[in-house]
Amino acid sequence: MIAGATAPSSQHEILIASNLIKKPSTSQNKTPTAQSSSGNNGAADGAPQGYHHHHHHHRHLWWPRTTDHQYWCVLRKNQFAYYKTRDEREAISVIPRFDILNFKISELDGILTVYTPSKDLIFKFPRGQNEKVGMELMHNWKIALEKFLSSPSGNESVTTGSDYDEEEDDDDLIVVDEKAGPSSSKHSCSLTMDEQLSREDKEFYRMFDPRNAEHQVCSGILYTKVKKKKLFNRAKWQKFNVELTNTSFNLYSFKTGKLKKSIKLDKIIDCIELDNNSKMKNDDTNFALITFDERLSFKAANDQDMVDWIINFKSGILIRKKLKAENI
């Protein structure tokens, strides 16, 4: 199904979702040197630049029936994910927008290939009630993927001004040890674990359990301050692709995807909303992440994103406190 109209500002807006049959992924021995443009619109020769075409030399793709697994696949503005079933809340795998290089749909074989730096994800479209239904599903996925690739990596809110700098340099340093300031009571997240569990189902909290295999909880775009050597170490707000898993919080270069900083969640003490200046619209979505030895200030795209990030961090902190109290 192609999603209906939703709020355009939502990074998690669903572009399309349907059942697809997954083939075991194929690894790439060589990472592409450049991201292919979406101008090929998923055509047969639309593999990302830097890929060899050795995996496209067969007219028909081999499909071992013993490995057929049908998953509920969801394409959002900022990520592609697939789930065991439509009702599952925890994804088997989530690939952020900046990790998806290109796609290819083979109408002859009914196969969708999604290219990432490390592997190719291959899915087969299930047979519809008739050929027309099957072709319509492929067409809808093609339209959704073209829209997905034509947008920037995630649905970011572009912020301008003298305190912002979109240019990245290898010697930029993320600013730490800032004064976090008093927390605001506007969005209080100081719930006990028992209160949280009584309000949410336990399956949701399994997402934050650090004992589980590492998996993505959420991802998006946040601004944080960096010291710019070219500006004599003056601090500027700069945007990063960020990812929160059940074990770590990672900041990646918005332009290159290179990991810039990783924080183990065991080191995080608290996450608080800063005492934001309501008179300045651009300064009312700031929050701070506090660890044992540093503090980092972040700016979200909007108020709801800020609240979501705080709640996600708080949830991870709370479940760790519970496990520690139970000596698990």
Curated annotation (Swiss-Prot):
The keyword Metal-binding does not apply. Residues 19-52 are annotated as: Disordered. It holds the Pfam family PH. Residues 24-41 have a biased composition (Polar residues). Keywords: Cell membrane, Cytoplasm, Membrane. GO terms for molecular function: phosphatidylinositol-3,4-bisphosphate binding; phosphatidylinositol-4,5-bisphosphate binding; phospholipid binding. Signal peptide: none annotated. One of its GO terms (cellular component) is mitochondrion. It is found in: Cell membrane; Cytoplasm. Residues 215-318 form the PH domain. PROSITE patterns: PH_DOMAIN. Disruption phenotype: Increases cellular level of phosphatidylinositol 4,5-bisphosphate (PtdIns(4,5)P2/PIP2). Its main location: membrane. Gene3D superfamilies: Pleckstrin-homology domain (PH domain)/Phosphotyrosine-binding domain (PTB) (2.30.29.30). It comes from the Eukaryota. It is a peripheral membrane protein. Coiled coil: none annotated. Binds phosphatidylinositol 4,5-bisphosphate (PtdIns(4,5)P2/PIP2) at the cell membrane. Negatively regulates the activity of phosphatidylinositol 4-phosphate 5-kinase MSS4. Present with 1560 molecules/cell in log phase SD medium. The PH domain interacts with membranes containing phosphatidylinositol 4,5-bisphosphate (PtdIns(4,5)P2/PIP2). Interacts with MSS4 (via N-terminus); to negatively regulate MSS4 kinase activity. This is Pleckstrin homology domain protein OPY1. The gene is OPY1.
